[in-house]
């Protein structure tokens, strides 16, 4: 597990830095994460019996369901993927099969483990890259092999000794030059010099075209079988020493890490720490009367069921068991209820959390409190144009009121409404910013009313503009 396991309270405090409210949901995922650490301390026999308690989040869009799961993955360093339930089709139909979510999870784990391994060999890789740079900056002369005549081979010749002496002195001089260049490289004096290196050509292969077509598994097997028969093309590129060092370091690091070991660790990490977030799960629930669409939706549920229950999925890195993967499902459940899911799938999500709708006070906090708060982002963006943007407390409250009012009158899209409203509010200022010198601009309630009042109060206009 992570080097320093966080307590549930610490996890909630970390989530509070980015997400406002929703304490019940934060507590549920914090306990689920802590239980993974607790399970890792059990003896092997009992460890296999303890399975994660999957979570079902119920709440309107834009209240923080996805963000909670994403932040949890970052806190724990666990492999995390987000999938939409609506993207999958049941077996036998065109579209993505549900097993692809497990393959995507393993790919994410591979990337995480590979990055960690590359950091471990970074120092050695940079040494090797610098050696290659020295040889690129001071290339050696190719040895000329002259054809000897038979008499010279029999009786020897003085020219050969002279040639050896010349070559020896050239090698000494070359070595001396390379040492000088290596010193200059270390001092950073040659960063803007250009060198020509060979790099692998990045072109989409025919196998990439199979992605998303439901044929990933077939494409994967074909690539494994034919990969060695089709070597990657290389092309020559002229780069600065600074850029070339990055490319060569990455290449050398790849040589130093053992991909078999990476695959083994990644599969273990995906199995034991993986988190799969299934969004829009309410869209595959039955919606009242039976129809052919409902039959198809139920088919997707039945395909998801064995993955959530615990099964073995074949990937190009080996077999992956999903018994201990944590599944977090989420949905608004406007048209359907959680009880509209098939009973077997309902039973696999024992922890249910209802997320609250956002109030005016929540909107005020979202605008100001998180580390990545929207107002901080807009201030930083306009500061690049030399404009210091300030918002009065009353103006912030007015923006929150407008967001809440529009959500109530039209579709409730939660905190995402703030993006639309702030864009409209600052549209003119953002457009004129490069051409004017204003110094400090303070947004007041009157300015908010002037820019948004008419639109917010007109239901027809707000549906189209906000």
From Swiss-Prot:
**What is the predominant subcellular site recorded for this chain?**
cytoplasm
- GO cellular component assignments: HslUV protease complex
Any single Pfam family the record assigns to this protein: AAA
Annotated GO molecular function terms are:
ATP binding; ATP hydrolysis activity; peptidase activity; proteasome-activating activity
Where found, per UniProt?
A: Cytoplasm
GO terms (BP aspect): protein unfolding; proteolysis involved in protein catabolic process
Q: Which residues bind ATP?
A: 20, 62-67, 279, 344, 416
List, as start-end ranges, the regions of compositional bias called Acidic residues. 158-174
Keyword tags:
ATP-binding, Chaperone, Cytoplasm, Nucleotide-binding
Q: Where is this region: Disordered?
A: 153-177
Q: What does this protein do?
A: ATPase subunit of a proteasome-like degradation complex; this subunit has chaperone activity.
Which NCBIfam families does the entry link to? hslU, PRK05201.1
Instruction: Give the family, as the similarity comment puts it.
Output: Belongs to the ClpX chaperone family. HslU subfamily.
Could you give the subunit structure recorded for this chain? Answer: A double ring-shaped homohexamer of ClpQ is capped on each side by a ring-shaped ClpY homohexamer. The assembly of the ClpQ/ClpY complex is dependent on binding of ATP.
Tell me which HAMAP family the record gives: HslU
Its recorded name reads ATP-dependent protease ATPase subunit ClpY
């Amino acid at each position: 597990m992570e080097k320093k396991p966080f307590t549930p309270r610490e996890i909630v405090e970390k989530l509070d830095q980015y997400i406002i409210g929703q304490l019940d949901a934060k507590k549920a995922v914090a306990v689920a994460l802590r239980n993974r650490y607790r399970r890792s301390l059990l003896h092997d026999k009992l460890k296999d019996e303890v399975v994660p308690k999957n979570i079902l989040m119920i709440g309107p869009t834009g209240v923080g369901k996805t963000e909670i799961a994403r932040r949890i993955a970052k806190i724990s360093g666990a492999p995390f993927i987000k999938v939409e339930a609506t993207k999958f089709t049941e077996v036998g139909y065109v579209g993505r099969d549900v097993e692809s979510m497990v393959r995507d999870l393993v790919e994410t784990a591979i990337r995480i483990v590979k990055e960690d391994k590359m950091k471990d060999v970074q120092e050695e890789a940079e040494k090797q890259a610098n050696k290659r740079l020295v040889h690129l900056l001071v290339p050696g002369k190719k040895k000329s092999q002259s054809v000897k005549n038979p008499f010279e081979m029999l009786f020897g010749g003085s020219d050969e000794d002279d040639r050896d002496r010349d070559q020896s002195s050239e090698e000494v001089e070359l070595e001396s030059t390379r040492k000088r260049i290596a010193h200059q490289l270390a001092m950073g004096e040659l960063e803007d010099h250009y060198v020509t290196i060979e790099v692998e050509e990045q072109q989409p292969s025919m196998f990439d075209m199979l992605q998303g077509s439901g044929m990933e598994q077939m494409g994967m097997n074909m690539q494994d079988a034919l990969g060695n028969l089709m070597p990657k093309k290389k092309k020559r590129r002229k780069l600065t020493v600074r850029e070339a060092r990055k490319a060569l370091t990455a290449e050398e690091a790849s040589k130093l890490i053992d991909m078999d070991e990476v695959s083994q660790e990644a599969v273990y990490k995906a199995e034991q720490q993986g988190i799969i977030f299934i969004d829009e799960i309410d869209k595959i629930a039955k919606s009242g009367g039976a129809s052919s669409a409902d039959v198809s939706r139920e088919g997707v549920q039945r395909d998801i069921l064995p993955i959530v229950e615990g099964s073995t999925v074949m990937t190009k890195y080996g077999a992956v068991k999903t018994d201990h993967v944590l599944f977090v499902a989420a949905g608004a459940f406007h048209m359907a209820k959680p009880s509209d899911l098939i009973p077997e799938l309902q039973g696999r999500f024992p922890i249910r959390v209802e997320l609250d709708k956002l109030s005016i006070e929540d909107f005020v906090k979202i605008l100001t409190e998180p580390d990545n708060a929207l107002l901080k982002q807009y201030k930083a963006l306009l500061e690049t144009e030399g404009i210091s943007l300030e918002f009065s407390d009353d103006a912030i409250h007015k923006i929150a009121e407008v967001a809440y009012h529009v959500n109530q009158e039209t579709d409730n899209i939660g905190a995402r409404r703030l993006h639309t409203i702030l864009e409209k509010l600052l549209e003119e200022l953002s457009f004129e910013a490069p051409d004017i010198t204003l110094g400090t601009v303070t947004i007041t309630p009157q300015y908010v009313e002037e820019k948004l009042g008419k639109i917010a109060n007109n239901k027809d206009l707000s549906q189209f503009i906000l």
